[in-house]
Amino acid sequence: MMATGTADSQARFGQSVKGLLTEKVTTCGTDVIALTKQVLKGSRSSELLGQAARNMVLQEDAILHSEDSLRKMAIITTHLQYQQEAIQKNVEQSSDLQDQLNHLLK
């Protein structure tokens, strides 16, 4: 009877160890999955940060180009103002010459 009791005890112990081992393997698998998800999330964050940095460089280039264009437009505006003033003076002189010509022809 003693041998049977020992065999039963060993069988129960074996089942208990199997149960604990299965539980530990399941927990370990769950932890590996969680770790993998975290690594992937970190990898994605790094990818997003890289993309954000590239976008900022593109925006900075666009801003610098816009500033350059605005400076050029300011120069063109100044030149157009000078030309407009010159044209206005010529129109006034033309009007004066027209008056003088009319006066001479009378």
Curated annotation (Swiss-Prot):
GO terms for cellular component: BORC complex; lysosomal membrane. The lineage of its organism: Eukaryota, Metazoa, Chordata, Craniata, Vertebrata. Belongs to the BORCS7 family. Pfam families: BORCS7 (PF16088). It comes from Pongo abelii. It is found in: Lysosome membrane. Its main location: membrane. This is BLOC-1-related complex subunit 7. InterPro entries: BORCS7.
